[in-house]
Amino acid sequence: MNHSDTLSLSLELLQQPSVTPIDHTCQTIMADRLAKVGFHIEPMRFGDVDNLWARRGTEGPVFCFAGHTDVVPTGRLDAWNSDPFAPEIRDGKLYGRGSADMKTALAAMVVASERFVAKHPNHKGSIAFLITSDEEGPAVNGTVKVIETLEKRNEKITWCLVGEPSSTHKLGDIVKNGRRGSLNAVLKVQGKQGHVAYPHLARNPIHEASPALAELCQTVWDNGNEYFPATSFQISNIHAGTGATNVIPGTLEVTFNFRYSTEVTAEQLKQRVHEILDKHGLQYEIVWNLSGLPFLTPVGELVNAAQTAILNVTGTETELSTSGGTSDGRFIAPTGAQVLELGVLNATIHQINEHVDVHDLDPLTDIYEQILENLLA
């Protein structure tokens, strides 16, 4: 069977067991290909994370492909129908960890760039790649550190296409033009431990905190807007007690998360949480962690270039969306770049037997190449 350039490169990348934060030569494989067509290669290692900044051209505007070579752990190997790091094609589907999220997109980006450069060796502006091996993990030494480095030397990205698997039912039907912000908190409520038979000698933090937690759950934080759904508040963990049935716990720990729209700020959310907790008279400590600001790329050059390319290649009228979790776009957008996420179908990401339709790989490559044509030819 003759494999297309994109499928062949996908297979090579999928054979690398690059579980976060280990890159396992994926970036070297990509860099070798890019260097042959005139990209300046700049590896950037921070801590235990490998990052790649590759650029062809010295002028603006800068079009950047962004993505990650790391994958999530496989889960139980005996639950897979084939070795997750020995990619297999069965019934027109390519199976392997990272097939959807997001090594096939990385392959498509490289091949699209090779083809575009062959046709337009003197293209305007610059093409760049920002690739990390720590998107699925803590995301501390990955894209955010590369962006810090670029900002220090005033190297700006104009347009950024992140190859995250954005599609839902067919290739290109959904493009992410923004993401909600993500704000995490760990709340510790202080009570007084005691015997369940003598509640008057103790203070039960579960009982004391319950009305406040109920109010937090029922609060309408905002109503969203035309781009974002309403802000959501979700409790993810509650811990209290010694495990014994006759002991009132002394402390309660609650972990919760906000996925928030551009209608509120993280500071406003924090303030309202404190007001509710204080109103209920709780003795508490709270530790906040802002893992991503919301961002939005309005309709403009990048959105138009992507929508036109998708329509030309697939005939699909694409829909803009800001749903889903966070991505590394949250680190790139604050620099002023227009950011879009466009990739294969996301139905099996992070799952056992993760796979992608083989027949989507070449059209994705064509879409990426045509976006380059629309912006830099």
From Swiss-Prot:
Catalytically driven reaction(s): N-succinyl-(2S,6S)-2,6-diaminopimelate + H2O = (2S,6S)-2,6-diaminopimelate + succinate
On the tree of life, the source organism's domain of life is: Bacteria
Pathway involvement of the protein, from the record: Amino-acid biosynthesis; L-lysine biosynthesis via DAP pathway; LL-2,6-diaminopimelate from (S)-tetrahydrodipicolinate (succinylase route): step 3/3
CDD domains, per database record = M20_DapE_proteobac
Annotated residues for binding of Zn(2+) 1: 68, 101, 164
Q: What is its EC number?
A: 3.5.1.18
Question: Which key words are in the record?
Answer: Amino-acid biosynthesis, Cobalt, Diaminopimelate biosynthesis, Hydrolase, Lysine biosynthesis, Metal-binding, Zinc
Report the active site residues. 70, 135
Instruction: Tell me how the cofactor is bound.
Output: Binds 2 Zn(2+) or Co(2+) ions per subunit.
Gene Ontology biological process terms from the UniProt entry: diaminopimelate biosynthetic process; L-arginine biosynthetic process; lysine biosynthetic process via diaminopimelate
GO terms (molecular function) for this protein are: acetylornithine deacetylase activity; cobalt ion binding; succinyl-diaminopimelate desuccinylase activity; zinc ion binding
Question: InterPro entries in the record, alphabetically?
Answer: Bact_exopeptidase_dim_dom (IPR036264), DapE_proteobac (IPR005941), Peptidase_M20 (IPR002933), Peptidase_M20_dimer (IPR011650), Peptidase_M20A (IPR050072)
Q: Where does Zn(2+) 2 bind?
A: 101, 136, 350
Cofactors named for this entry: Zn(2+); Co(2+)
Give the multimer and partner information. Answer: Homodimer.
Which HAMAP family does this entry report, sorted A to Z? DapE (MF_01690)
What family is this?
A: Belongs to the peptidase M20A family. DapE subfamily.
Function of the protein: Catalyzes the hydrolysis of N-succinyl-L,L-diaminopimelic acid (SDAP), forming succinate and LL-2,6-diaminopimelate (DAP), an intermediate involved in the bacterial biosynthesis of lysine and meso-diaminopimelic acid, an essential component of bacterial cell walls.
| Name this protein carries in UniProt | Succinyl-diaminopimelate desuccinylase
Q: Which organism is it from?
A: Acinetobacter baumannii (strain SDF)
What phylogenetic lineage does the species belong to?
Answer: Bacteria, Pseudomonadati, Pseudomonadota, Gammaproteobacteria, Moraxellales
